[in-house]
C-alpha cells in the first residue's frame, strides 16, 4: 500500500495466515523521500521503491538506499536487469544482484529540458513520451535513446487493453 506523499507500507501474508506489515517513511530512516513514484519487484524478489528524491531497494527485509538525489518517475524489469527512468528522461540500469545504478542514456542530451509524461514497452523498445519534445525510444541492445519516427505525440498517454493491444494518444 502506498500514497504519493506519505511513504509506503509492505503487508505480508505468512504461511500460518497471519499478516505482518512494515512502514517505510523518511522519519523511520528506511526511505530517502516519502513522495513515492513507483514500487516494482525484480526477478530476484527485490522490491524497488522510487521516489522524487532517491531510490531504495528492499531485499529479505533489509533496506538499502541506492540513490538520494534523483527524481525517479518509473521502473521497468527487462531480462535479468532493472531499468529506471528519471523525470528528466535519464535511463539507469541496475545489473542483476548489484547494489548500484549506472546511467546508460540521457534524453536531456538530445531533447533538451523536457519531462517524461509516460512510457511503455513496444516491440522490445522502451518508448518514452515527453511533455513537449515528442516520443523517443530506448534500445535495450545498444543503450541509446533515439527519436521515434512513427509517433508524433506530445504529452502522450498509453493504455494497454485486455487484448494486449497498446493505445497511445
Give residue ranges: language-model regions.
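Carboxylate-rich, polar loop motifs that coordinate divalent cations or form catalytic acidic clusters
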Residues: 1-169
Amino acid at each position: 500500500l502506498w500514497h504519493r506523499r506519505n511513504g509506503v507500507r509492505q503487508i505480508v501474508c505468512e504461511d500460518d495466515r497471519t499478516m505482518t506489515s512494515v512502514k517505510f517513511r523518511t522519519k523511520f530512516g528506511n526511505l530517502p523521500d516519502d513522495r513515492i513514484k513507483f514500487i516494482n519487484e525484480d526477478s530476484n524478489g527485490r522490491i524497488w521503491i522510487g521516489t522524487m528524491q532517491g531510490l531504495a531497494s528492499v531485499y529479505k527485509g533489509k533496506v538499502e538506499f541506492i540513490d538520494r538525489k534523483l527524481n525517479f518517475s518509473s521502473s521497468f524489469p527487462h531480462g535479468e536487469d532493472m531499468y529506471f527512468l528519471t523525470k528528466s528522461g535519464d535511463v539507469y540500469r541496475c545489473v542483476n544482484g548489484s547494489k548500484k545504478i549506472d546511467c546508460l542514456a540521457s534524453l536531456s542530451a538530445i531533447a533538451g529540458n523536457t519531462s517524461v509524461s509516460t512510457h511503455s514497452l513496444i516491440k522490445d523498445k522502451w518508448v518514452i513520451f515527453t511533455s513537449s519534445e515528442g516520443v523517443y525510444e530506448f534500445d535495450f541492445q545498444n543503450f541509446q535513446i533515439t527519436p521515434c519516427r512513427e509517433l508524433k505525440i506530445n504529452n502522450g498517454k498509453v493504455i494497454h487493453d485486455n487484448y494486449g493491444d497498446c493505445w497511445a494518444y
